[in-house]
């Protein structure tokens, strides 16, 4: 039976133990995390880097397994010790029997908007009011924190102004600890192996930084707000189930000062800037078609998983060193047909009329956005609906206005844009059909369409190196 192949950069868990490695082999215990560096030519061996020790060495493919997708039911909680609106007396009851360092956090009944840290010490439960000061949280006004997670992490290490270090969280009934589940499934990364570098982007919910994790280039999104971090954790749990060459790959999560989401680094940046800085002289029509096809294949995969992106635009497409376009930024991604997103935050020029008007998102609204992305691509990164305000765009589109094709845009591509912009969502093509049409157009200009689909972990380059 053939052993699964693992591509360089893949993070795996070990299925067994190798406590007495031979020279050149890697020592590991069952359940350790390793990153594949390269494949050997014979016997399905790999050179890998151990996450905890930082050592490199050889290990057999048979000793590896893929990380598990995270379960989203029940929902994972970044703050399983947060009990919401309970009284001080209820907190005391929760922290029985007494145990030094047993703790929970609750909302303050006397001071709405503030929190209370409740800590068991001796035979008592001490209640510390958590104050808001200049956008931060504090107990003693000497040490301030970005959020509750930051505060709990600090007092777990250092008792400071409170009676004792926080030792054991009292978990709210039904809460599932994100930290425990991430670690068990292999998605919890170690902060000590992360080096942060320059900022490479700025999203609505936080900065995106370049970094290195165990020597591998990564992109890191840091979300500090408790509520936003929890929302992003929910989306991250969905991302652990996704694997496709045209989706930016999740590497893992670090819980420190909020939430660090660690993604693969895609070296050539977003598609808008790529096209604007190169233009027609350097980017051929066939290359534009390939980019469009890559995006459509990634979206076809999301469609098959009944997931809706909701913010599909060229700015959210990243280009790799080998010119593969990858769909990124799943911050708004949700299960199909969800409602209720604040309309003031919607990217109006890319959003389908039914989503703007009724908050109704589906794969068909993503298809509308893909039509706008096509226009961006074949205009070499121009902003859509030039010289029109957002209000003018929404009103004109509602009345049937559609953009003219960019200069030199192939006729079939313009026809495809038009079908993506059908007013009736059911008349828009599924991404499967879009992939077929773009593939045909690419072949018509003499370029073979690349084989798409779910990423095979076995596309690893090999070298002759055998233990």
UniProtKB/Swiss-Prot annotation:
According to the entry, every stretch annotated as the SH3 domain falls at 7-69
Q: Where does ATP bind?
A: 200-208, 221
What is said about its interaction partners and assembly? Interacts with KIT.
- Chain spans, region Disordered: 1-20, 445-467
Active-site residues are 311 (proton acceptor)
Catalytic activity, reaction form: L-tyrosyl-[protein] + ATP = O-phospho-L-tyrosyl-[protein] + ADP + H(+)
Q: What is this protein called?
A: Megakaryocyte-associated tyrosine-protein kinase
Entry's localization field: Cytoplasm; Membrane
Q: What is its main location?
A: cytoplasm
* Record function comment: Could play a significant role in the signal transduction of hematopoietic cells. May regulate tyrosine kinase activity of SRC-family members in brain.
**Residues of the SH2 domain:** 81-170
The alphabetical list of record keywords is: ATP-binding, Cytoplasm, Kinase, Membrane, Nucleotide-binding, SH2 domain, SH3 domain, Transferase, Tyrosine-protein kinase
Instruction: Supply the InterPro entries for this chain.
Output: Csk-like_SH2, Kinase-like_dom_sf, Non-receptor_tyrosine_kinases, Prot_kinase_dom, Protein_kinase_ATP_BS, Ser-Thr/Tyr_kinase_cat_dom, SH2, SH2_dom_sf
- Which gene is annotated as encoding this protein in its UniProt record? Matk
**Any Pfam family hit:** SH2
- CDD domains this protein is in? SH2_csk_like
Q: Which organism is it from?
A: Rattus norvegicus
An annotated GO cellular component: plasma membrane
Which EC number(s) does UniProt give?
Answer: 2.7.10.2
Tissue specificity as recorded in UniProt: Enriched in lymphoid tissues.
A GO MF annotation of the entry reads: non-membrane spanning protein tyrosine kinase activity
- Domain Protein kinase span(s) in chain numbering: 194-443
Q: Which SMART domains match?
A: SH2 (SM00252), SH3 (SM00326), TyrKc (SM00219)
